[in-house]
Amino acid sequence: RQEWQALKDFYRYGFPAVVQQCWAYIATATLLFIIGGAIGWWFSWQDDSFMTLVLGSDFVENVRSTQELWTVSILGVEPVASSSITINNIAVSLIAIIGGVTTYRPEISIITPPGAFTLYLLIFNGLMIGCVSALVAQLNLAYDLWAFIFPHGSLELPAIFFAGGAGLLL
């Protein structure tokens, strides 16, 4: 009983207090993602080669040739797809937090400044969303994309922004 009360108190008082104390970091993480998204959308809208560079030619050509989103491929295997999406988002969140401490890049044998990988992760994920948004807008598939993203993204994206804020704070 006491444990449940402590958990309830944390979510009622503790968590909101932490968010208020760290709001600038969370807002910065959110802004970095949005800036990445805006850059991705703008440059993809202007030049298809940018979109292909970020998303890969196979992905872009597949969506263009089928005139369908990859979301139709999860029909019938929703539990597996849901698990895969959840694992991906947990991994992104953990990397966003851990990336705030330091990042080792073996290909160049250096340790980057603290937070560098968190910055990269937030901007690049925004960039990918922006590029995909431009692609589906060009093909009149935007409704299908956002109908897929909004139900789970309304929880997942803020979680990633909180994790990114934590990474920037570290």
What residues fall within each predicted segment?
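Interfacial/capping segments of alpha-helical transmembrane domains
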Residues: 41-66
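Small-residue-enriched core segments of transmembrane alpha-helices in multipass membrane transport
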Residues: 54-61, 116-132
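Soluble N-terminal domains of membrane-associated systems
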Residues: 1-8
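Hydrophobic alpha-helical membrane-insertion segments
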Residues: 30-44, 155
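Alpha-helical transmembrane segments and their helix-start/interface "positive-inside/aromatic belt" motifs
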Residues: 15-35
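Individual transmembrane alpha-helix segments
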Residues: 75-117
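Hydrophobic alpha-helical transmembrane segments and adjacent short intramembrane/lumenal linkers
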Residues: 127-170
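Short aromatic-rich membrane-water interface segments that cap or initiate transmembrane helices
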Residues: 66-84, 146-155
